[in-house]
């Protein structure tokens, strides 16, 4: 019984099952049925989860369809009736998935009973779900002749069907009060088993009604199925258990798909804090029924009730993120842009290339993020909603390091924010203001105050250049403890500075007693502004001067004790800069007893006001050796009313000039004439690099002096469609300007003696210089021995290399033409142009390093196809020679050049003879032919 999954106990006997098993219902429907249903499911999945990949949606849809298709095939009677009833256009289906999740209306217990009575078991629910998914596709009517043998009479079957349809059509369509019951119950008239009597249906209706009362609002469909299995364990046969396994498998796949889709649903953090809500997991059955009901709709359109006003929510999230991060992001973008501009103004350095690329990439990323934050309300799209979490992550990652607020260390008496700029002097706590310089160490600044107790302590982020020498040796927290915390007062050492003759870098200036006037106070605040760049440049000088100052102090000042009240603390006009890196480890050499490292010592504040012995100023310094440094006071003041610190002005430091500054100065100092000449020379060099020259300046000098049009000078031995660029000819070009020729001549005279000395010591180099000349002589000898009408000779002209001429001397001319040709008296007047018939020799220049470099033609050769050139034998020969040399892949040897010149000259002579009625033997009588005879 367990082996046959298609078998089901029937109250009326097994004959009906045996008759129905003979016909497989899957063979009754259309072949394209499953494909159409699958396409519908995929379409609805894409509408629900448009942000996911298509292959994932297809995979889930195929598994979904396959499971429910296999479940529907297990029922014989239901399957055949499903084929018949699917031909109807309108099916009686009740679907609660169409109602919104928050539109919950009441429906009576009677309605619940009518709905639950339609679903006889969990297996029938699965069949109903699958059959409803197919209900949008029209199926052709199939023959039901085999059912006549199963049922007793057709009339009885029709009556039972009508009763069942009437029972289903009378179900109410009101919306349920339970959100998770949406789509949980769907009943089709074609899915009811005809062998179930109305009495059994009413009995099961009462049972399911009692079960529904015990369910809580918000339970999911799997929980309802679990309760159903617990209350009715005897009604679940093996077949129902198998169907339940399939249902659990489909639900697991749906849960995985919805878990992936939940990535794009980002909730606002502030809304979660103000309105804490528990996120309810979506019921898989709701998703399934939404897809199934949408497939029944003829228009194929559904309304996404869960969407809501997502556009407004997304805009509010972006707006909140913009208010929080856009100022910091804009400041970072401005700093990066300034840094890039500074870097571009400097000469490029190889080590900074990668760093600059990272800066540019970061700048582009910040611009993209700022563009996302500045989106308009009407421009918010689904892309902004889906990508909000990713943008939020990157924005917070960019601004994390910049949004960290520097909080001061909490003291025993109280705590103040760093942004506070004024506080009352009666407070038993002195703050240390933290100022972060540009990529510099953190510094702590002592606040300054006026003489009166009612004045405010102004916290300044910068130092005055006049007060930069005052360095306080303390990096800990400054506070005013009570007498119980520090019962004893420790004497301090006052050191003085030696004379200006030893240092020669600073001078003394006694400060005037400060007046509690508002005008002086404003002037003081204006003069306290300092440039960060000057501070970084002078910090090293101050460290050296401080070390020399303390080490050179030998005489002692009588120890004195000074106690001040917490409400009458007076500081000087300049704050005390704390820098742990520039102070020496141990500086005290006077022998005055001091406290150990890390202990509290007393630093007296110079004030004419009588002090209070119960409230000394204690400075806790955790740094070893730094607590031995005390404030430097002026010992030259003998009045005793006001002791002011010493000031120094460091000597002016040399300013390093940038290359661009030096260029500007040189440009301003030059005369207009020299600038014009420089521009001309630069243009000449650039044009020579960009263009290919074909002529060689035998007289020396620069190209600008020759006045040649280099664009018309083409290289003689250019390759024709060459693939190897390394085969191009190489030659040296003299680019020395004319006005520098005198300097070069003097330099050559000075270097001539040196060259003679070098030549005597390196005689082996002469062999290398002679070797190319010997190779050229050998080639000329071989060429003259092979050619008949062309003679190759070496000229005695002075040049940078060897000049060779190729002369054509025809030997097969008629007597009349030969005499005229040799005499050179054949003159033609064509178009009023005088042209000579004799072919002029070809002049070549072989460099000194030949054969390692190619020879150069010393005259202009161009290809001209005009008519009158046929009468000018020399021009015609050179035109042929120019065209022939372009066909060579590797020109540059004397053998090939001489052979080419010989062939071109002979072809020109033959062409000229044929045009005037002459020619060769072959041209008049025909070429020789090879005749083979059979022996």
UniProtKB/Swiss-Prot annotation:
GO cellular component, one term: nucleus
Family: Belongs to the plant Mediator complex subunit 15 family.
Keywords, ordered alphabetically: Nucleus, Transcription, Transcription regulation
Subunit structure, as described in the record: Component of the Mediator complex.
Function field: Component of the Mediator complex, a coactivator involved in the regulated transcription of nearly all RNA polymerase II-dependent genes. Mediator functions as a bridge to convey information from gene-specific regulatory proteins to the basal RNA polymerase II transcription machinery. The Mediator complex, having a compact conformation in its free form, is recruited to promoters by direct interactions with regulatory proteins and serves for the assembly of a functional preinitiation complex with RNA polymerase II and the general transcription factors.
Name of the protein in its database record: Probable mediator of RNA polymerase II transcription subunit 15c
Composition skew (Low complexity), residue ranges: 511-526
Subcellular location: Nucleus
Molecular function GO labels: chromatin DNA binding; transcription coactivator activity
Pfam families: KIX_2
């Amino acid at each position: 019984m367990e082996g046959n999954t298609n078998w089901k106990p029937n109250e009326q006997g097994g004959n009906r099952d045996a008759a129905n098993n003979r016909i497989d219902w899957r063979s009754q429907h259309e072949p394209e049925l499953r494909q159409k249903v699958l396409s519908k499911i995929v379409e609805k999945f894409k509408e629900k989860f448009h942000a996911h990949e298509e292959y994932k949606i297809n995979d889930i849809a195929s598994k979904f369809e396959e499971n429910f298709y296999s479940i529907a095939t297990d029922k014989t009677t239901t399957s055949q009736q499903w084929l018949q009833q699917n031909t109807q256009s309108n099916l009686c289906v009740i679907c609660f998935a169409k109602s919104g999740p928050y539109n919950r209306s009441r429906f009576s217990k009677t309605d619940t009973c009518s709905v639950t009575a339609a679903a006889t078991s969990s297996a029938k629910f699965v069949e109903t779900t699958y059959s409803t998914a197919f209900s949008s596709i029209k199926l052709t009517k199939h023959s039901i002749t085999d059912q006549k043998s199963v049922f007793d009479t057709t009339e009885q079957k029709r009556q039972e069907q009508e009763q069942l349809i009437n029972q289903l059509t009378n179900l109410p369509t009101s919306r349920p009060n339970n959100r998770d019951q949406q789509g949980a119950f769907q009943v089709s008239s074609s899915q009811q088993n005809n062998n179930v009597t109305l009495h059994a249906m009413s009995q099961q209706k009462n049972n399911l009604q009692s079960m529904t009362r015990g369910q809580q609002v918000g339970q999911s469909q799997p929980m309802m199925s679990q309760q159903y299995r617990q209350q009715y364990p005897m009604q679940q046969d093996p077949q129902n258990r198998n169907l339940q396994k399939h249902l659990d498998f489909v639900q697991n796949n749906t849960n995985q798909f919805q878990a992936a889709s939940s990535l794009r649903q980002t909730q606002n953090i502030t809304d979660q804090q103000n309105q804490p809500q528990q996120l309810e997991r979506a019921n898989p059955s709701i998703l399934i029924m939404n897809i199934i009901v949408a497939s029944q709709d003829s228009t194929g359109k559904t309304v996404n009730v869960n969407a809501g006003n997502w556009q407004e929510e997304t805009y509010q999230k972006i707006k909140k993120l913009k208010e929080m991060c856009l100022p910091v992001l804009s400041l970072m973008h401005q700093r990066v842009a300034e840094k890039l501009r500074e870097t571009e103004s400097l000469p490029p350095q190889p080590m900074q290339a990668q760093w600059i690329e990272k800066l540019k990439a970061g700048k582009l990323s910040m611009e993209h993020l700022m563009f996302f934050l500045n989106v308009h309300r009407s421009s918010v799209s689904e892309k902004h909603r889906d990508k909000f979490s990713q943008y939020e992550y990157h924005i917070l990652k960019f601004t994390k390091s910049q949004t960290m607020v520097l909080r001061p260390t909490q003291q025993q008496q109280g705590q103040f924010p760093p942004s506070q700029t004024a506080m009352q002097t009666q407070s038993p706590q002195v703050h240390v203001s933290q100022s972060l310089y540009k990529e510099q160490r953190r510094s702590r600044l002592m606040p300054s105050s006026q003489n009166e107790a009612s004045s405010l302590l102004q916290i300044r982020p910068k130092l005055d250049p006049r007060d930069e020498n005052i360095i306080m040796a303390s990096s800990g927290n400054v506070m005013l403890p009570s007498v119980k915390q520090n019962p004893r007062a420790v004497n301090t050492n006052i050191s003085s500075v030696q004379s200006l003759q030893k240092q020669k870098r600073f001078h003394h200036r006694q400060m005037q007693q400060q007046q509690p006037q508002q005008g002086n106070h404003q002037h003081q605040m204006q003069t306290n502004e300092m440039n960060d760049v000057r501070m970084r440049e002078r910090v090293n000088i101050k460290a050296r001067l401080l070390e020399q100052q303390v080490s050179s102090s030998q005489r002692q000042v009588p120890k004195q004790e000074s106690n001040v009240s917490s409400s009458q603390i007076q500081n000087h006009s300049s704050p005390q800069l704390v820098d742990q890196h520039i102070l020496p480890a141990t500086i005290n050499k006077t022998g005055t007893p001091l406290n150990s490292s890390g202990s509290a010592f007393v630093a007296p504040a110079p004030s004419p006001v009588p002090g209070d012995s119960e409230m000394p100023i204690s400075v806790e310094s955790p740094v070893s050796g730094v607590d031995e440094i005390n404030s430097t006071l002026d010992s030259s003041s003998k009045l005793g009313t006001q002791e002011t610190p010493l000031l120094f002005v460091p000597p002016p430091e040399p300013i390093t000039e940038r290359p661009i500054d030096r260029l500007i100065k040189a440009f301003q100092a030059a005369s207009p004439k020299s600038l014009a000449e420089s521009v001309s020379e630069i243009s000449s060099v650039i044009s020579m690099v960009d263009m290919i020259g074909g002529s060689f300046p035998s007289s020396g000098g620069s190209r600008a002096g020759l006045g040649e049009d280099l664009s018309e000078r083409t290289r003689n031995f250019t390759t024709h469609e060459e693939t190897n660029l390394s085969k191009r000819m190489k030659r040296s070009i003299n680019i020395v300007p004319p006005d520098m020729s005198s300097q070069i001549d003097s330099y050559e005279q000075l270097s001539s003696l040196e060259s003679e000395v070098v030549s005597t010591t390196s005689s082996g180099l002469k062999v290398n210089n002679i070797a190319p000349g010997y190779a050229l002589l050998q080639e000329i000898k071989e060429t003259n021995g092979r050619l008949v009408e062309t003679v190759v000779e070496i000229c005695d002209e002075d040049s940078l290399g060897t000049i060779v001429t190729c002369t054509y001397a025809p030997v097969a001319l008629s007597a009349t033409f030969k005499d005229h040709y040799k005499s050179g008296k054949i003159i033609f007047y064509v178009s009023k142009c005088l042209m000579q018939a004799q072919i002029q020799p070809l002049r070549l220049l072989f460099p000194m390093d030949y054969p390692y470099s190619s020879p150069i033609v010393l005259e202009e050769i161009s290809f001209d196809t005009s008519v009158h050139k046929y009468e000018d034998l020399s021009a015609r020969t050179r035109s042929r020679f120019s065209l022939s040399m372009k066909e060579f892949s590797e020109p540059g040897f004397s053998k090939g050049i001489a052979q080419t010149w010989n062939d071109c000259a002979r072809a020109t002579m033959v062409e000229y003879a044929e045009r005037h009625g002459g020619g060769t033997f072959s041209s008049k009588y025909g070429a020789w032919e090879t005749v083979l005879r059979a022996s």
